Amino acid sequence: MCYTRVYLKNSGMELAPDAPMLRREGSSAAVCAAGLLLSYELRGKDMRKLFLALALAAALLAAGCGRSEQGAQPQTVSRPVVESAERQFTAPAAGQTVAVFDTSAGVFKAVLYPDLAPQACENFIGLVNKGYYNGLTITRVEKDFVVGAGQGADGKGTTIWGGSRYPAEYTDRLHHYSGALCAAADAAGECASVFYVVQTLPDSVSQELTDQMTAAGYRAEVIAAYQAGGGAPYLDYGDTVFGQVFEGMETVDRIAQAAVDENQTPVEPITIHSVSLSSYEAAAAAPAQ
């Protein structure tokens, strides 16, 4: 999956026929990223789209090297409690739909946002109810970036609509913060069953990236949330954010530590035993003293 190619196509930036595919692993990332940017012909003057394209390439330049060491030195990620009024950092309301991912590496839970990403949630919930994800394995692990799955035995994704994909859904109320549950879009800007969780570190948003978000017109509240919790703003408006992990992020971090092969697939399979749905139950209020 090439996140950069997906984003730029969705952004109205035209990809030249001979543009190279951008890769994240290995020292070739710098060469590919530079070649990719030079191969794009920008259409229009949307500063946010331009920022996202350049920021993604810059992030890949920084993160492209050293992937072969992944899994060698497990680390514990300390994640802060982010104080923000942004939707993804507010506690789920009682009755909200929650997806429970039971994997061989542990369990994590994500609250879904059908009001903001209706098609993504409808498709995901429908596939969960059919048991589609049960028994699948994690197929994409990029430490400090994303953990993904959702491809069937044929290596492809599917939908509840007979395989017909749905267009990616965007909103300024959902972003690629650490822990975001996202539907991956293809080069045509369409999504299916493949999903990923953003696994970036809390300090992943540099001052330079912050300055670029400001210049691109991001809301101050969004920038502050990115600064506090980390994330991948260069993926915004490319893929669909439809949920947020609120419990078990340590499991996602554990999966991200796995040793991977040249395709970023775990050497030792990590199985999704099941994905199930439940309704969030708010903690009972403490009795008055």
Model-derived features with residue positions:
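Exposed boundary/loop context
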Residues: 5, 11, 16-19, 28, ...
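Sec-dependent N-terminal signal peptides of Gram-positive bacterial secreted proteins and lipoproteins
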Residues: 49-67
